């Protein structure tokens, strides 16, 4: 997708595909922290783009404030498309979320201690990040990006025997973790990039182009934590 014509190869940017290479449940917050720490020395801001949101029209320009980049793309998504189910999760109000594709200045990311490492399986690392911004009284900007959601089975919701949409165990467990984490507004200071340990298993160059002082690079990085 990105090797075709979707990006200007003369921009000064680094595009990293982070892969969690272990048998543990998925932990998006830790993956995001790994991406930041690997590239911290030379970045001035980062964009966290979930792999299941494909940018069609997106504004990735620098902002001094954290920014939610998606406006169109939080469609009513099917719960279990692999079973041809028509039951859906309703689109969230974007004033209540900070997910999908978000921009975070380096100084803001460090101030809020990055993402929590406590959420395994599905969800709430984004809700936790929004709370970190809110308790630090950091305003969130909103841009008008258009993204194509890539449809897949939802790990946060399932369909019970009565054909109703209910939260999965991952959802329930992470909701409990979120409530425990935020029984004190200072707990986030102990859970984030300052407490995260990981190892880089591989760091593969996919594409590289140098022109004048601009380096455009695509890398696939596997990490374990």
Task: Mark where each language-model region is.
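Conserved donor-nucleotide/metal-binding helix-loop-beta segment in metal-dependent transferases, i.e.
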Residues: 55-87
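A recurrent flexible, glycine/aromatic-enriched loop bordering the glycosyltransferase active site
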Residues: 75-104, 111
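C-terminal catalytic/acceptor-binding lobe
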Residues: 118-121, 125-225
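Conserved nucleotide-sugar donor-binding catalytic segment
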Residues: 104, 114-119
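Active-site-proximal specificity loops/subdomain of glycosyltransferases
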Residues: 4-43
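Short beta-strand-to-loop acidic/aromatic patch adjacent to the donor-nucleotide binding site
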Residues: 42-56
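Short alpha-helix within the catalytic core of nucleotide-sugar-dependent glycosyltransferases
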Residues: 32-33, 37, 57-68, 110, ...
